[in-house]
């Protein structure tokens, strides 16, 4: 596989942290715009201690805009400023 590419399957169940190191939860799924193919949201199973009141929710999951992703390595890191109160 070429440098800089990753299969979505490898992302499932990766730990998700904010840029300050706080645990957000675990990646459950990814939402893709069917017309454009653009990744739009991460579907995250929130950590039990995470206050989810400021997040857009669907069932037991929080939805995070894909543009909040800072990096993907062993964990997924989100930009703390881009995820604040986006319910």
Where are these regions (language model features)?
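Peripheral interaction segments used for macromolecular assembly
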Residues: 1-87
